């Protein structure tokens, strides 16, 4: 509820599928190649060419449908969506209108610790358009890169079930993690491989839904939050002023922090959909549908609940780990060894590892860290072989070099001194050299103990076992 108005949000999420070739031709499906280098007569829309559907696209879409609990339409067709734009050489896009590959479904998300179910209207397959290039060096004209033409997409259309920008963000993050878990989309928003259109309306409680506006050019999840919040405020201001919200398509300008009108919102009839005459009806055998369902891994929302219930993680930590394929695998591999509590691993994963990745821009795959090495490091710390400070030094090496924990400890001389006689000798020397602190402690100044332990650690060059060192000093102080 915002200023007495209920907010209604629906999202249309486009995900580029990471197949090797495009959806209707053999051109390479790869980002960042030379302009117009991955094109052919089919994806350029030349007269007389005939498309051939990439079977892998159907498989990927069905897997996403299973992940979102969708009905799978084993018999469906493809349609032409007619509109003119410079980056669409055929002047139509091959999509699905009446019967999508995946029908009704849902996804459960956690918002502030509470479970919310968001309905899925449909998932359909379609081809991407090209990309317009704008630059001052083009002397007042725009050029077209058709490399993206024919890149396979799935469009995931939600029900208008979200009631806040935060819910929308969590929904998008959940979709992203599922796509990555399935391995069907890399979800690199900076490359446009996942993007969304946002539909927003507001209404007074008890009244019918208001007129919605669609917002495009939303290129990050944080931009989606800002865009939704702005659009809600804009629509409320229009209604409070006695105006009428128009059904229109708007463009989000993240730099200006505002949405800008583009055109009146089209209805399906404006696109003059009709069946694609150059492609056969899609018929998927039930056996294949069942096989694809079996290939679905444990999904992040399921992992979150398992991490909370089985390992005692809080929701924030569980969500952070579960939504990253690589971090979740590292954590699960460590816990599978069943040696130490989860906290021993999450301290390193959510602390030093994430800090390193944020500072360097690297992913876990870019490091040399393995579950075996992390478990060995935790074992060394738990056995008091090295201190926590020494552990940080070892961890830093594990990130950069393929070495054993034991070798790093030996090379850097990080092994703690735990021999009682050696520690007692250090304690005797420190106590003799710090008579005032000894008297202070005996006189009731307990903070003097910390100073004495610190001096012992300094004398041992950090190698003394601090726990044992403290015990020995206490025994000697009486």
Sequence positions of predicted segments:
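Strongly charged, low-complexity linkers/loops
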Residues: 364-375, 379, 388-458
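Extended, non-catalytic structural segments that build the interaction scaffolds
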Residues: 288-295, 302, 332-340, 374-386
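Amphipathic alpha-helical core segments of compact helical bundles
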Residues: 18, 233, 328, 350-358, ...
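Short, amphipathic C-terminal "tail helix"
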Residues: 446-478
């Amino acid at each position: 509820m915002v200023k007495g108005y209920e907010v209604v949000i629906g999202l249309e999420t486009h995900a580029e599928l990471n197949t090797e070739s495009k959806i209707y031709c053999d051109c390479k499906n790869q980002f960042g190649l030379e302009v117009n280098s991955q094109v052919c007569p089919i994806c350029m829309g030349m007269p007389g060419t005939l498309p051939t559907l990439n079977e892998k696209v159907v498989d990927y879409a069905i897997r996403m449908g299973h992940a979102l609990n969708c009905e799978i339409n084993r018999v469906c067709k493809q349609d032409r969506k007619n509109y003119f734009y410079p980056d669409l050489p055929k002047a139509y896009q091959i999509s699905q209108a009446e019967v999508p590959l995946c029908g009704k479904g849902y996804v459960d998300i956690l918002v502030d610790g509470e479970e919310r179910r968001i309905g899925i209207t449909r998932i359909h397959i379609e081809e991407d358009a090209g990309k317009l290039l704008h630059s001052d060096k083009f002397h007042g004209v725009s050029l077209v890169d058709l490399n993206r033409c024919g890149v396979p997409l799935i469009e995931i259309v939600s029900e208008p079930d979200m009631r806040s920008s935060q819910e929308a963000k969590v929904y998008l993050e959940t979709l992203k993690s599922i796509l990555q878990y399935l391995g069907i989309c890399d979800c690199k928003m900076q490359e446009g491989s996942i993007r969304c259109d946002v539909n927003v309306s507001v209404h007074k409680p008890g009244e019918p839904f208001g007129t919605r506006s669609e917002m495009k050019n939303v290129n990050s999840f944080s931009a989606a939050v800002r865009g939704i919040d702005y659009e809600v405020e804009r629509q409320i201001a229009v209604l409070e002023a006695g105006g009428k919200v128009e059904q229109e398509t708007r463009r989000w300008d993240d730099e200006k922090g505002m949405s800008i009108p583009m055109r009146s919102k089209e209805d399906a009839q404006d696109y003059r959909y009709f069946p694609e005459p150059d492609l056969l009806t899609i018929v998927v055998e039930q056996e294949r549908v069942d096989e694809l369902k079996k290939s679905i891994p444990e999904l992040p929302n399921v992992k979150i609940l398992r991490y909370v219930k089985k390992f005692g993680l809080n929701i924030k930590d569980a969500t952070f780990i579960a939504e990253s394929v690589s971090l979740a695998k590292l954590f699960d591999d460590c816990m599978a060894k069943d040696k130490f509590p989860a906290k021993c691993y999450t301290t390193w994963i959510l602390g030093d590892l994430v800090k390193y990745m944020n500072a360097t821009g690297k992913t876990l795959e870019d490091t040399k860290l393995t579950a075996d090495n992390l478990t060995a490091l935790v074992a060394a710390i738990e056995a008091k072989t090295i201190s926590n400070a020494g552990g940080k030094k070892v961890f830093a090496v594990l990130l950069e070099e393929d070495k054993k924990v034991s070798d790093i400890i030996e090379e850097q001389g990080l092994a703690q001194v735990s021999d009682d006689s050696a520690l007692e000798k250090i304690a005797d020397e420190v106590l003799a050299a710090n008579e005032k602190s000894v008297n202070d402690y005996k006189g009731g100044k307990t903070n003097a103990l910390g100073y004495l332990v610190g001096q012992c650690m300094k004398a041992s060059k950090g190698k003394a076992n601090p726990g044992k060192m403290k015990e020995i000093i206490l025994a000697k102080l009486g």
